[in-house]
Amino acid sequence: MREFSQIRETTETKIKLSLQLDEGKNVSVQTGVGFFDHMLTLFARHGRFGLQVEAEGDVFVDAHHTVEDVGIVLGNCLKEALQNKEGINRYGSAYVPMDESLGFVAIDISGRSYIVFQGELTNPKLGDFDTELTEEFFRAVAHAANITLHARILYGSNTHHKIEALFKAFGRALREAVERNAHITGVNSTKGML
């Protein structure tokens, strides 16, 4: 089974995270940031991943360090769980509607970290979650995992729906990218490595 666990502790946060790419039944998320817990749960459910997250952070300041550090650890676990990347699709993309909103995510498990994030989030806060942290989370994942990630909110009016569409699209796109493909021998690159 492709899986990896990591504990990362700093003066600001303590993150314990386990990711299972091939087993999506066990999902448990506790970060101390309710909206973020909801989004991570949606990501795992729609990507059919197993995900267990326990996070303690300086949320008395704000949720920034917790959200960013969870993204770093998730990216690290993804990179390690993929091992040598042999036989995977490598690319994945998904459009996901959430009522009036439409989100799009495209992923390349390229070994090169890059992110493009486009979207207007008009409501600055949802519960104790600063909505600008959405981009920070995706940036942290992309850099830690060494993947190229494009995330775009095409349209919508409800900020919750916009972010939810992105997290669901992220799960579905990542599922497609990490899926093993019997038609691919070795790594899916003319270079012979990713």
UniProtKB/Swiss-Prot annotation:
Protein name, UniProt field: Imidazoleglycerol-phosphate dehydratase
Domain of life: Bacteria
Main location group: cytoplasm
PROSITE patterns (UniProt xref): IGP_DEHYDRATASE_1, IGP_DEHYDRATASE_2
Annotated GO CC locations: cytoplasm
E.C. numbers: 4.2.1.19
Keywords linked to the UniProt accession: Amino-acid biosynthesis, Cytoplasm, Histidine biosynthesis, Lyase
GO molecular function: imidazoleglycerol-phosphate dehydratase activity
Pathway: Amino-acid biosynthesis; L-histidine biosynthesis; L-histidine from 5-phospho-alpha-D-ribose 1-diphosphate: step 6/9
